[in-house]
Amino acid sequence: MSEKSRRKHSEHEWLNKISDSLTLGAISYICFAFILGTLIIGVNVERGGVLSDWGAVFLAEVTLIAGVIHFYINHPRSFSRNGRVVLIFGLMFIHLMLISLVFSFVEGDIFGEGGERYGFLLCPLAFAPFSVSILLGRAQALFVTVLCSIWGSLLVSIDLSVPLLATNLIVGFVCVLLTDSVRKRSGLVRAGFIIGLIMLIFGLLFGFVTGSAPGEGVMDWKQFSLGCVVAILGGVVTVSVVGAILPFIENFFRITTDISWIELADLNHPLLRKMTIEAPGTYHHSLIVANLAEAAAETIGANAI
């Protein structure tokens, strides 16, 4: 074995030890529990959440423990891989931080008294569910959706906690459904538009678009138009940001998504075009075998990609 091969082999062994270390896994969960508690108690003091400061922290930590147990039982492979743990809980932390930052921004002088309404419409509720669904699959995205919905409701005031909880759950579930139909990165914009529409519908139901619930008061068309734009734009921007950071996450965590596989299968790919010229027989034979494999996978319900 050459020196280069030995160095590469030892590097892989070192990475595997880190990835499978129970000690590092436990440290990751403890760090997230501490960060989560700090984030919630800090925000709860400012905004007057639905529970007392320590009550909110207690609820967050209990749901975290329940979530970790669920994660261990239903996703043992991801649970035992520290890279996946860091990815999932890191995305959830970013999701919660974005919610907190959005409400901190809209509570300033720019938006005035209507800040909370725009904060609700601008919330990137699709961030973690959409990211995890594309990267790791639907089952783990549902897990993330439920936890982010509960924790997100603890970051806002009493008036917003239930609307945000309900909306986050529905948006997350829709994200899980939409990712199955997203085959190219360009399809992310369409998914973002659909998510924006859902945000708009819930904004109308809870009175965050017009400032009053349906049937209450006079319709303010200016507020309605602005609310529609904010809701749709929020959904499109959130999903577009997810699409922009996906290649970096895939590269860093060594994950290949369905979108990446489909892009590699593009017949205009330079390697495939070169193959059609230099080895046309092999090229056509490969296409036939690939089509047969895809049909077989679809027949047994496996992932054809």
Model-assigned labels for residue ranges:
Residues 51-62, 115-122, 164-165, 226-236:
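Alpha-helical transmembrane segments of polytopic membrane proteins
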Residues 19-24, 35-42, 63-112, 129-139, ...:
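Short helix-perturbing small/polar motifs within transmembrane alpha-helices
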Residues 117-121, 159-163, 167, 278, ...:
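Alpha-helix N-cap/helix-initiation motif
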Residues 143-147, 165, 188-206, 210, ...:
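Acidic/His-rich, divalent-metal-binding segments that scaffold phosphate/diphosphate chemistry
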Residues 1-90, 132, 277-300, 305:
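Membrane-embedded alpha-helical signal segments
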Residues 112-116, 275-276:
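Active-site-adjacent structural elements in folded domains
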